[in-house]
Amino acid sequence: MTHQYPPFYGVYLLQSTKKPLSCYVGSTPNPFRRIRQHNGDLKAGGAWRTKRAHLRPWSMVLIVNGFPSKISALKFEHALQHPNMTRLITTKDIKRKVPQKARALGTHLAFIRLLVRCSYFRRMHLRITFFRSHAHEAWEKNDYDVGSLPPQFQVETDYPSDEAEAPPSTVGSGELDINNRSIEEYLQKCRDAVSNDKQLTCYLSEKTLNISEGNVALCHNCDGAFDVAELAERFLNEEIPEELPFTTPSRHIIPIGGDCPSCLARMEWSNVIKGVLAMRPVLEDNKE
Protein backbone atom coordinates (compact mmCIF):
# COMPACT_ATOMS: atom_id res chain seq x y z
CA MET A 1 0.00 0.00 0.00
CA THR A 2 1.43 3.40 -1.02
CA HIS A 3 1.80 5.97 1.75
CA GLN A 4 -0.19 9.08 0.91
CA TYR A 5 0.98 12.43 2.24
CA PRO A 6 -2.26 14.03 3.47
CA PRO A 7 -3.24 17.06 1.36
CA PHE A 8 -4.54 18.59 4.57
CA TYR A 9 -5.04 17.46 8.13
CA GLY A 10 -5.28 20.07 10.83
CA VAL A 11 -5.77 20.42 14.57
CA TYR A 12 -8.34 23.12 15.29
CA LEU A 13 -9.54 25.10 18.29
CA LEU A 14 -13.20 25.97 18.81
CA GLN A 15 -14.45 28.67 21.16
CA SER A 16 -18.01 28.89 22.43
CA THR A 17 -19.73 32.10 21.36
CA LYS A 18 -21.98 31.91 24.42
CA LYS A 19 -19.28 31.04 26.96
CA PRO A 20 -15.92 32.21 25.57
CA LEU A 21 -14.00 30.51 28.39
CA SER A 22 -15.09 27.15 26.95
CA CYS A 23 -12.90 25.78 24.16
CA TYR A 24 -12.72 22.49 22.30
CA VAL A 25 -9.80 20.82 20.48
CA GLY A 26 -10.30 18.51 17.50
CA SER A 27 -8.73 17.46 14.20
CA THR A 28 -10.05 17.18 10.66
CA PRO A 29 -9.15 16.97 6.96
CA ASN A 30 -11.99 19.40 6.20
CA PRO A 31 -12.56 22.28 8.67
CA PHE A 32 -15.38 23.73 6.56
CA ARG A 33 -17.48 20.61 7.03
CA ARG A 34 -16.34 19.94 10.59
CA ILE A 35 -17.50 23.24 12.11
CA ARG A 36 -20.95 22.72 10.56
CA GLN A 37 -21.10 19.31 12.22
CA HIS A 38 -20.18 20.78 15.60
CA ASN A 39 -22.86 23.46 15.29
CA GLY A 40 -25.55 21.02 14.18
CA ASP A 41 -25.83 22.45 10.66
CA LEU A 42 -25.12 18.91 9.47
CA LYS A 43 -26.87 16.08 11.28
CA ALA A 44 -24.06 13.53 11.06
CA GLY A 45 -20.82 13.97 12.98
CA GLY A 46 -19.99 16.49 15.67
CA ALA A 47 -18.95 15.62 19.20
CA TRP A 48 -20.88 15.00 22.39
CA ARG A 49 -19.35 17.95 24.21
CA THR A 50 -20.05 20.43 21.42
CA LYS A 51 -23.71 19.37 21.19
CA ARG A 52 -24.57 21.09 24.47
CA ALA A 53 -27.09 23.83 23.76
CA HIS A 54 -25.67 26.23 26.35
CA LEU A 55 -22.33 26.27 24.47
CA ARG A 56 -23.54 26.40 20.87
CA PRO A 57 -22.82 27.92 18.46
CA TRP A 58 -19.06 27.39 18.28
CA SER A 59 -16.55 29.42 16.32
CA MET A 60 -13.39 27.92 14.82
CA VAL A 61 -10.74 30.44 15.84
CA LEU A 62 -7.59 28.73 14.52
CA ILE A 63 -6.11 25.62 12.95
CA VAL A 64 -2.60 24.14 12.96
CA ASN A 65 -1.53 22.14 9.90
CA GLY A 66 1.54 21.01 7.97
CA PHE A 67 1.89 17.66 9.72
CA PRO A 68 3.73 14.98 7.70
CA SER A 69 1.12 12.37 8.60
CA LYS A 70 -2.28 11.98 10.19
CA ILE A 71 -0.61 10.16 13.09
CA SER A 72 1.57 13.16 13.94
CA ALA A 73 -1.50 15.44 13.78
CA LEU A 74 -3.41 13.15 16.14
CA LYS A 75 -0.45 13.17 18.51
CA PHE A 76 -0.55 16.98 18.54
CA GLU A 77 -4.31 16.92 19.10
CA HIS A 78 -4.08 14.49 22.02
CA ALA A 79 -1.31 16.49 23.69
CA LEU A 80 -3.31 19.71 23.35
CA GLN A 81 -6.41 18.01 24.76
CA HIS A 82 -4.49 16.49 27.69
CA PRO A 83 -1.53 18.76 28.47
CA ASN A 84 -1.35 17.39 32.01
CA MET A 85 -0.77 13.86 30.66
CA THR A 86 1.62 14.37 27.75
CA ARG A 87 5.40 14.11 28.03
CA LEU A 88 5.89 16.38 25.04
CA ILE A 89 5.35 19.66 26.86
CA THR A 90 7.91 21.26 29.11
CA THR A 91 7.34 24.52 30.96
CA LYS A 92 11.01 25.18 31.79
CA ASP A 93 11.31 27.88 29.12
CA ILE A 94 8.39 30.06 30.24
CA LYS A 95 8.33 32.78 32.85
CA ARG A 96 4.77 32.25 34.06
CA LYS A 97 3.23 28.97 35.12
CA VAL A 98 0.53 27.71 32.76
CA PRO A 99 -2.46 26.25 34.62
CA GLN A 100 -2.64 22.64 33.38
CA LYS A 101 -6.41 22.26 33.77
CA ALA A 102 -7.57 25.65 32.54
CA ARG A 103 -9.50 25.51 29.26
CA ALA A 104 -9.50 29.19 28.28
CA LEU A 105 -8.21 30.48 24.94
CA GLY A 106 -4.97 31.92 26.33
CA THR A 107 -4.05 28.64 27.99
CA HIS A 108 -4.57 26.68 24.78
CA LEU A 109 -2.41 29.18 22.89
CA ALA A 110 0.39 28.73 25.42
CA PHE A 111 0.25 24.95 25.05
CA ILE A 112 0.30 25.26 21.25
CA ARG A 113 3.48 27.32 21.54
CA LEU A 114 5.02 24.73 23.86
CA LEU A 115 4.10 21.86 21.54
CA VAL A 116 5.54 23.61 18.49
CA ARG A 117 8.82 23.98 20.41
CA CYS A 118 9.03 20.38 21.63
CA SER A 119 11.50 17.90 20.13
CA TYR A 120 8.82 15.90 18.31
CA PHE A 121 7.25 18.82 16.40
CA ARG A 122 9.89 21.54 16.19
CA ARG A 123 11.44 20.36 12.91
CA MET A 124 8.11 19.97 11.13
CA HIS A 125 7.01 22.74 8.78
CA LEU A 126 3.91 23.63 10.78
CA ARG A 127 1.60 26.57 10.22
CA ILE A 128 -1.04 28.17 12.42
CA THR A 129 -3.87 30.07 10.75
CA PHE A 130 -6.12 32.37 12.76
CA PHE A 131 -9.72 32.81 11.63
CA ARG A 132 -10.66 35.35 14.31
CA SER A 133 -8.73 38.54 15.08
CA HIS A 134 -9.15 38.33 18.86
CA ALA A 135 -7.42 34.92 18.86
CA HIS A 136 -4.49 36.28 16.87
CA GLU A 137 -4.22 39.27 19.20
CA ALA A 138 -4.09 36.89 22.18
CA TRP A 139 -1.38 34.88 20.41
CA GLU A 140 0.70 38.00 19.83
CA LYS A 141 0.41 38.99 23.50
CA ASN A 142 1.97 35.66 24.54
CA ASP A 143 0.68 36.12 28.09
CA TYR A 144 2.66 33.16 29.46
CA ASP A 145 5.95 34.35 27.94
CA VAL A 146 6.68 31.13 26.07
CA GLY A 147 10.10 31.30 24.40
CA SER A 148 10.93 31.69 20.71
CA LEU A 149 9.43 29.40 18.08
CA PRO A 150 11.21 27.44 15.33
CA PRO A 151 12.24 29.70 12.41
CA GLN A 152 10.22 27.72 9.85
CA PHE A 153 6.99 27.91 11.88
CA GLN A 154 4.47 30.13 10.08
CA VAL A 155 1.75 32.33 11.55
CA GLU A 156 -1.02 33.43 9.18
CA THR A 157 -4.37 35.19 9.41
CA ASP A 158 -7.47 34.49 7.32
CA TYR A 159 -10.42 36.49 8.60
CA PRO A 160 -13.95 36.62 7.15
CA SER A 161 -14.54 39.65 4.92
CA ASP A 162 -16.93 41.03 7.55
CA GLU A 163 -15.81 39.41 10.77
CA ALA A 164 -18.40 41.12 12.96
CA GLU A 165 -21.30 39.85 10.84
CA ALA A 166 -19.87 36.45 9.85
CA PRO A 167 -21.94 33.42 10.99
CA PRO A 168 -20.24 31.25 13.64
CA SER A 169 -19.74 28.39 11.17
CA THR A 170 -17.67 30.61 8.87
CA VAL A 171 -14.05 29.46 8.49
CA GLY A 172 -12.03 32.54 7.64
CA SER A 173 -12.44 33.87 4.12
CA GLY A 174 -13.27 30.39 2.85
CA GLU A 175 -10.01 30.21 0.90
CA LEU A 176 -8.04 27.88 3.18
CA ASP A 177 -6.10 25.47 0.94
CA ILE A 178 -7.08 21.93 1.93
CA ASN A 179 -6.27 20.35 -1.46
CA ASN A 180 -2.60 21.26 -2.03
CA ARG A 181 -3.61 23.87 -4.63
CA SER A 182 -0.58 25.98 -3.74
CA ILE A 183 1.86 23.28 -4.85
CA GLU A 184 -0.26 21.35 -7.36
CA GLU A 185 1.86 22.60 -10.27
CA TYR A 186 4.95 21.16 -8.56
CA LEU A 187 3.22 17.85 -7.79
CA GLN A 188 2.12 17.55 -11.41
CA LYS A 189 5.69 18.23 -12.50
CA CYS A 190 6.77 15.26 -10.39
CA ARG A 191 4.06 13.01 -11.82
CA ASP A 192 4.93 14.02 -15.37
CA ALA A 193 8.59 13.16 -14.81
CA VAL A 194 7.51 9.58 -14.12
CA SER A 195 4.91 9.38 -16.88
CA ASN A 196 7.40 10.63 -19.47
CA ASP A 197 10.09 8.27 -18.17
CA LYS A 198 12.44 11.23 -18.18
CA GLN A 199 16.17 10.50 -17.97
CA LEU A 200 17.53 12.41 -15.00
CA THR A 201 20.99 13.07 -13.62
CA CYS A 202 21.69 14.02 -10.01
CA TYR A 203 22.91 17.61 -9.90
CA LEU A 204 25.07 16.83 -6.86
CA SER A 205 26.81 13.58 -7.81
CA GLU A 206 26.19 13.58 -11.58
CA LYS A 207 25.07 9.96 -11.38
CA THR A 208 22.15 8.70 -13.45
CA LEU A 209 18.95 8.55 -11.43
CA ASN A 210 16.54 5.65 -11.71
CA ILE A 211 13.20 7.32 -11.17
CA SER A 212 11.48 3.93 -10.88
CA GLU A 213 13.23 3.42 -7.53
CA GLY A 214 11.19 6.27 -6.04
CA ASN A 215 14.19 8.11 -4.60
CA VAL A 216 14.29 11.15 -6.88
CA ALA A 217 13.60 14.71 -5.72
CA LEU A 218 12.88 17.57 -8.10
CA CYS A 219 13.20 21.31 -7.61
CA HIS A 220 9.97 23.25 -8.06
CA ASN A 221 11.75 26.19 -9.67
CA CYS A 222 14.24 24.67 -12.12
CA ASP A 223 15.18 21.41 -13.84
CA GLY A 224 17.35 20.29 -10.94
CA ALA A 225 17.01 16.62 -9.98
CA PHE A 226 18.58 14.98 -6.95
CA ASP A 227 19.00 11.71 -5.14
CA VAL A 228 16.77 12.19 -2.07
CA ALA A 229 19.39 10.94 0.41
CA GLU A 230 22.13 13.12 -1.08
CA LEU A 231 19.91 16.20 -1.04
CA ALA A 232 18.94 15.54 2.58
CA GLU A 233 22.62 15.23 3.54
CA ARG A 234 23.41 18.48 1.72
CA PHE A 235 20.65 20.37 3.53
CA LEU A 236 21.61 18.92 6.93
CA ASN A 237 25.23 19.94 6.43
CA GLU A 238 24.11 23.49 5.67
CA GLU A 239 22.10 23.81 8.88
CA ILE A 240 23.95 25.80 11.53
CA PRO A 241 23.25 26.15 15.28
CA GLU A 242 22.29 29.83 14.96
CA GLU A 243 19.36 28.85 12.74
CA LEU A 244 18.29 26.01 15.04
CA PRO A 245 18.32 27.34 18.62
CA PHE A 246 16.75 24.19 20.07
CA THR A 247 19.13 21.46 18.99
CA THR A 248 22.31 20.37 17.21
CA PRO A 249 21.98 19.66 13.46
CA SER A 250 24.26 16.61 13.55
CA ARG A 251 21.69 14.71 15.61
CA HIS A 252 19.08 14.69 12.85
CA ILE A 253 18.48 12.66 9.72
CA ILE A 254 15.62 14.73 8.27
CA PRO A 255 16.28 18.34 7.23
CA ILE A 256 13.93 21.29 7.49
CA GLY A 257 14.84 22.49 4.02
CA GLY A 258 17.49 24.38 2.12
CA ASP A 259 18.39 26.25 -1.05
CA CYS A 260 18.30 24.34 -4.32
CA PRO A 261 21.95 23.55 -5.26
CA SER A 262 21.08 24.40 -8.87
CA CYS A 263 19.04 27.62 -8.76
CA LEU A 264 19.19 28.57 -5.05
CA ALA A 265 15.38 28.65 -4.71
CA ARG A 266 14.18 27.71 -1.24
CA MET A 267 13.08 24.06 -1.01
CA GLU A 268 11.00 23.11 2.03
CA TRP A 269 11.62 19.47 2.88
CA SER A 270 7.94 18.79 3.54
CA ASN A 271 7.15 19.82 -0.05
CA VAL A 272 10.07 17.80 -1.41
CA ILE A 273 8.65 14.67 0.20
CA LYS A 274 5.17 15.47 -1.08
CA GLY A 275 6.68 15.51 -4.55
CA VAL A 276 8.46 12.18 -4.01
CA LEU A 277 5.26 10.57 -2.77
CA ALA A 278 3.25 12.05 -5.65
CA MET A 279 5.40 9.98 -8.03
CA ARG A 280 4.68 6.63 -6.39
CA PRO A 281 1.09 6.01 -7.58
CA VAL A 282 2.27 6.71 -11.14
CA LEU A 283 5.16 4.29 -10.68
CA GLU A 284 2.78 1.59 -9.45
CA ASP A 285 0.45 2.16 -12.42
CA ASN A 286 3.41 1.78 -14.78
CA LYS A 287 4.25 -1.60 -13.25
CA GLU A 288 0.80 -3.03 -13.91
Curated annotation (Swiss-Prot):
InterPro entries: GIY-YIG_endonuc (IPR000305), GIY-YIG_endonuc_sf (IPR035901), Slx1 (IPR027520), SLX1_C (IPR048749), SLX1_endonuclease (IPR050381), Znf_RING/FYVE/PHD (IPR013083). Keywords: DNA damage, DNA recombination, DNA repair, Endonuclease, Hydrolase, Nuclease, Nucleus. It is an enzyme of class 3 (hydrolase). PROSITE patterns: GIY_YIG. Its main location: nucleus. GO terms for molecular function: 5'-flap endonuclease activity; crossover junction DNA endonuclease activity. The keyword Cytoplasm does not apply. Its cofactor is a divalent metal cation. Its EC number is 3.1.-.-. It is found in: Nucleus. The keyword Magnesium does not apply. Residues 7-90 form the GIY-YIG domain. Belongs to the SLX1 family. Forms a heterodimer with SLX4. Catalytic subunit of the SLX1-SLX4 structure-specific endonuclease that resolves DNA secondary structures generated during DNA repair and recombination. Has endonuclease activity towards branched DNA substrates, introducing single-strand cuts in duplex DNA close to junctions with ss-DNA. HAMAP family: Endonuc_su_Slx1. PANTHER family: STRUCTURE-SPECIFIC ENDONUCLEASE SUBUNIT SLX1 (PTHR20208:SF10). This is Structure-specific endonuclease subunit SLX1.
